[in-house]
């Protein structure tokens, strides 16, 4: 299964009003306690996988996530384990993901590096209160999930205040429409960093992520695919830049990635105006406030729509 979702950080000034709005949308609340696993040298994190055991209400679910085929998609498989273990976390078992694309991808990764499931050990944990509700727009049903809590690892904790928009059914453009409305109302800013990535950093005692490779796009590919490839390293970096955590190397990479993205956009008349805006942003990589503005988020959402294949719009 592939999930289609976007995640945003919530500025402190908007947290109370957003929480109230979500409660008004016939929401439910669940406590989610999770334990994340990886090899000692972070093989899963380095390969864009996340493997966790999470208590959801009275039961546990083992979840495996991996890289999908688009900017808003990820491989995912959930294996409910029932309520027999109570509050005690059950043992991890990759057999629960047997016969699924996500499970096959993880086993291939372990085999290719000479690892076994026994090499997967606990790295960090999360304790989250999730308030969630479903909303409709443009023929799509989208689940909104407000997550408030903390990540713990390496003897440290990190607060969490974020909201996810996940497509339940309908076209991805409906998800983008709903995300824009909430972004405009509450000043949200797009953040591609998952809890797994942030927890991995916390466990290692580092604040910045890796510097993604910035490569020219293949002009022979469909234009939507070119936009997706050019946008990927940009979205991988904007979370650290907006948090004012980015290293000099990350900022240089972001400026380079924005240059590639602007050049890609200029190939299409409909994106000419956006190309100029993207090029201007390349000169503002040291101004964290720029990356949190509603106008910047609207730009990312437009680019994400252009990155969708024609039959998905």
What do the PLM-derived regions correspond to, one by one?
Residues 1-313:
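Function-determining surface determinants
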């Amino acid at each position: 299964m592939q999930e289609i979702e976007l995640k945003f950080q919530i500025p402190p000034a908007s947290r109370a009003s957003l929480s109230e709005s979500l409660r008004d949308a016939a929401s439910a609340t669940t406590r989610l306690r999770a334990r994340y696993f990886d090899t000692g040298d972070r093989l899963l994190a380095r390969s864009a996988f996340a493997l966790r055991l999470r208590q959801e209400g009275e039961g546990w679910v083992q979840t495996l996530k991996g890289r999908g085929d688009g900017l808003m998609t990820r491989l995912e498989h959930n294996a409910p384990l029932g309520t027999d273990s109570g509050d005690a976390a059950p043992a991890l078992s990759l057999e629960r993901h047997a016969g699924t694309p996500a499970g096959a991808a993880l086993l291939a990764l372990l085999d290719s590096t000479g690892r076994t499931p026994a090499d997967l050990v606990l790295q960090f944990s999360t304790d989250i209160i999730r308030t969630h509700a479903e909303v409709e727009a443009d023929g799509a049903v989208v689940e909104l999930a407000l997550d408030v809590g903390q990540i713990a690892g390496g003897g440290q904790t990190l607060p969490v205040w974020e909201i996810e928009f996940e497509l339940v059914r309908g076209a991805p453009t409906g998800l983008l429409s709903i995300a824009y409305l909430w972004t405009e109302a509450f000043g949200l800013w797009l953040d591609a960093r998952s809890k797994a990535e942030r927890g991995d950093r916390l466990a290692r005692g580092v604040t910045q992520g890796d510097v993604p490779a910035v490569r020219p796009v293949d002009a022979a590919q469909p234009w939507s695919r070119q936009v997706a490839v050019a946008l990927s390293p940009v979205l991988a970096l904007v979370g650290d830049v907006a948090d004012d955590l980015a290293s000099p190397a990350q900022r240089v990479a972001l400026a380079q990635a924005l240059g590639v993205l602007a050049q890609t956009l200029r190939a299409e008349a409909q994106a000419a105006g956006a190309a100029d805006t993207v090029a201007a942003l390349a000169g503002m990589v040291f101004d964290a406030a720029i990356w949190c503005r509603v106008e910047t988020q609207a730009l990312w959402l437009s680019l994400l729509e252009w990155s969708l294949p024609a039959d998905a719009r």
